[in-house]
């Protein structure tokens, strides 16, 4: 098995774990309506809850950049004060259409750790457009299996200084944003390198480069491209 094929499988497993947390499960089938009863309106016809009805505003400010995952999908924002706002990647198109860098936003949701929040809704304070966290529509179709999605990833290499450390819900480091905006993700238990803002950092792996920047799932990391060390002791 080639290094590239083995790496694709490893990345597929790592990304599948993140996708399983990010995309909500499909809704259960509705029970049949009893004879003579008035059926409820379809879910699509029900408006989302009003902003602030279920959760408070947990962050607000100007959008510094849109964050993307290794597939190139928008899965959050970074505000000018450094706050990282997480949002499900299946809403990438809706979020990137409603929110642009420089826009002022209000974020409704829940705080997580180290300056990050999980958004239930993001409001463009200027236009009033609001993007809600909601399941994919019933006609969206089933997503591709992780190993097929991973085939679309391409080798990427980045090098620079750490601008911000990304963390999971329990505060574990699972990625970095470099000063040029490149995003590197990695399993928290795999990193053998201390990462702090301002530190030199380099990585190679599989990911995407598009108009919003570069994002990759790391296979190896180091303080420079000439000093990379593998994250995995062996490939699957």
Where would I find each of the regions flagged by the language model?
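Structural detector for short beta-strands of small beta-barrel domains
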Residues: 52-71, 148-170
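Short nucleic-acid-contacting surface segments enriched for D/E, G, S/T with interspersed K/R
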Residues: 91-108, 189-204
């Amino acid at each position: 098995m080639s290094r590239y094929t083995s790496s694709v499988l490893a990345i597929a497993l790592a990304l599948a774990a993140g996708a399983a947390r990010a995309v909500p499960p499909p809704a259960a089938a509705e029970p049949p309506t009893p004879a003579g009863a008035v059926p409820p309106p379809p879910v699509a016809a029900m408006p989302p809850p009003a902003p602030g009805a279920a959760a408070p505003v947990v962050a607000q400010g100007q959008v510094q950049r849109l964050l993307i995952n290794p597939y190139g999908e928008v899965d959050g924002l970074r505000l000018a004060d450094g706050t990282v706002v997480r949002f499900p990647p299946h809403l990438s198109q809706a979020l990137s259409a409603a929110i642009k860098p420089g826009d002022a936003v209000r974020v409704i949701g829940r705080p997580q750790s180290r300056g990050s929040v999980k958004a239930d809704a993001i409001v463009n304070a200027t236009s009033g457009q609001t993007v809600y966290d909601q399941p994919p529509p019933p006609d969206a179709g089933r997503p591709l299996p992780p190993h097929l999605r991973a085939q679309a990833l391409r080798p990427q290499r980045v090098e620079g200084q750490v601008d911000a450390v990304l963390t999971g819900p329990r505060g574990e480091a699972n990625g970095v944003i470099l000063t040029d905006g490149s995003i590197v993700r990695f399993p928290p238990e795999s990193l053998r390198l201390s990462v702090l803002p301002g530190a030199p950092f380099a990585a190679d792996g599989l990911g995407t480069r598009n108009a919003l920047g570069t994002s990759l799932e790391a296979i190896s990391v180091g303080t420079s491209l000439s000093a990379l060390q593998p994250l995995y002791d062996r490939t699957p």
